[in-house]
């Protein structure tokens, strides 16, 4: 009988240890806003970042996007300020405060009514996004044919 209690105790201790080491699910939701000459404009939707032990999902829900139906890019930008800046010539750069594009996270499909409801799963962690911005751009990178076009930030979620 004493052996049974020892085995049960060991199994209980192991299960507690495994549970304590399991990665907690982290979910953060931020507003997606339109970028304009004043910085952040009207809200068009939300982006939810969920980090689990199996990876990170980025769920985009938006309506009223002012782009043609089809593909747009979702990118990670280095800063979290939607404020416009000026270039060397003094021209206004909408979204200039976002800094540099740090990477393409995938493409989103915009419906004919300007809506998006899509989830992208990647290997990012929330710590990779914190203090930065998720940006919807008007173009997607085409790595298959080695072409990259100029991407204009249109909508942003500040983290």
Region spans (language model):
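N-terminal leader/targeting pre-sequences
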Residues: 6, 16-159
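Bacterial N-terminal signal peptides that target proteins for export
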Residues: 1-9
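Short, linear, compositionally biased motifs with a strong N-terminal bias
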Residues: 11-14
């Amino acid at each position: 009988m004493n052996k049974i209690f020892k085995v049960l105790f060991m199994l209980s201790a192991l299960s507690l240890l495994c549970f304590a080491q399991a990665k907690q699910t982290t979910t953060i939701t931020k507003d997606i806003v339109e970028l304009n000459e004043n910085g952040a404009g009207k809200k068009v939707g939300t982006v939810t970042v969920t980090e689990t032990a199996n990876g990170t999902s980025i769920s985009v829900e938006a309506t009223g996007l002012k782009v043609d139906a089809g593909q747009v890019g979702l990118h990670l930008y280095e800063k979290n300020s939607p404020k416009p800046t000026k270039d060397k010539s003094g021209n206004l750069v909408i979204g200039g405060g976002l800094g540099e594009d740090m990477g393409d996270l995938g493409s989103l499909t915009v419906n004919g009514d300007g809506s998006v409801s899509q989830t992208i799963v990647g290997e990012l962690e929330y710590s990779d996004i914190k203090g930065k911005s998720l940006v919807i751009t008007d173009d997607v990178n085409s790595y298959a044919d080695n072409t990259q076009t100029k991407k204009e930030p249109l909508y942003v979620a500040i983290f």
